[in-house]
C-alpha cells in the first residue's frame, strides 16, 4: 500500500466499514459509542470527562452491561456529531492505524445515504478537513457505489442494512431523488421482532445481553418465505421449518415459524404497526415513477445491497411479488396478456458480498480517482472557496 492510498469510509447505521482503495474487504465494527453507567457517588467523584471514558465499537457491545450505548447515525442520517467524530477517530486512528502526518497526505472517500441533507454532507466534509486534516475529500451516494461494484451505471438498488432500507433508481450514475423510497425497517427491527415472537412462546430472550445472541441467531436460521401462508401451514402441521438453536450461554431454543415471520415485516410492515408498504411494493412504486423508457431497464437491473437482503429467499420473494404486482396493476389481471415475458425480464442481482457492496464500489471509485487531485474537493479549495462553492465539484454525484 502506498503512503497516499485514499481512505474509504462507509458509514452505516449499525456498522462502519473502513479500509483503503486497494482493500479487497473492509474492516467492520459497530457504529456505536459506550459511556460508563456510573453510580451517583462515582459520578460525583469523577473529574474526568465522559469523552475520555467513552469506548467505541465492539468493546462497548462486548461489555454492554457496563455502558450506556448510543448510535450517532439514525436511519442513515447522522444525529450526533460529537459521537460521530469518536466513531471516525476509532476507524481512522485505531482500525486503520493512521497518524496525523499520514492523514495530511491522503484523500478520503465518504459514503452517504440517498436522502442525506446537504447541511449534513457539508458537515462531514468540514470535519474531515478541520478535525482530521485530510488532503482531499469526496462524498458519494451509497446506492451508486453499489452499482459500481457490479460494473453498472444504471439500475435500481434495494439497500437494507441495520437501521434503514432504501430503494434508489440510478440512471447513468445519477440518482433520481423524487423516486427514491425509504422504509425505517431493517436488520435491527427484524432482530427486535424475533425477540418479540420468541417471547410469545415463553422464551426469556429480552435482556440487553441477549440482543447480539439473537441477532446471530437471526443471521443463522431466518429466511424469507416466498409464500407466507404456505409456510405458516407447514409450521402448524409439520416440523419442516423447526430448528434447534443453542445460544452462547447454553440455552437451547426451538425456532419454528419465527424463522420466516421475523423478516416478513420487511415485506409487510403492518405486522409491527408501521403504516407503509413493504420493500416489494416500494420497488414497484419506484420503477413506476421513473420515465416510461427507463422502467424496463430498472426491472432488468435490480441489485440487492446490505446485510438485511442476505436472508435466503429474499431475491426470489422480491421477484415473485413484482410479477404479481405487475400482473394486478399493469396488466389488470387480463388472462390474454402474457405476464411470462415480463417475468423473464425481471432480474434481481444478489451479489455474494452484498453486505459490503457499498465499500467495494467506493474502493473501485477511489482507485480510479487516486492519481488525479482534480476529482477531489481539496483542502485548499475548501479554504479558498468555502464549503458551499467547494462542494459544487461533487454535485454531479448527488441527487437530481
Language-model-detected regions and their locations in the chain:
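Phosphate/ATP-binding catalytic cores across multiple sugar-kinase/actin-like superfamilies
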Residues: 87-95, 261, 267-298, 317
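Conserved phosphate-binding loops in N-terminal lobes of ATP-dependent enzymes
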Residues: 2-127, 136-138, 166, 176-180, ...
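A short acidic Gly-Thr/Ser loop motif
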Residues: 9-14, 150-152, 157-165, 170-174, ...
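Catalytic phosphate/nucleotide-handling subdomain of diverse soluble enzymes
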Residues: 303, 311-341, 367
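Conserved phosphate-binding catalytic cores of ATP/NTP-utilizing and phosphoryl-transfer enzymes
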Residues: 1-6, 120, 130, 134-158, ...
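Acidic, glycine/GT-rich loop-and beta-edge segments that sit at the periphery of enzyme/chaperone cores
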Residues: 196, 204-243, 334-335, 339-400
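Phosphate-binding glycine-rich/basic clefts of nucleotide- and phosphate-handling proteins
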Residues: 171-273, 300-301
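Glycine-rich phosphate-binding loops at beta-strand->alpha-helix junctions
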Residues: 111-120, 128, 226, 300-321, ...
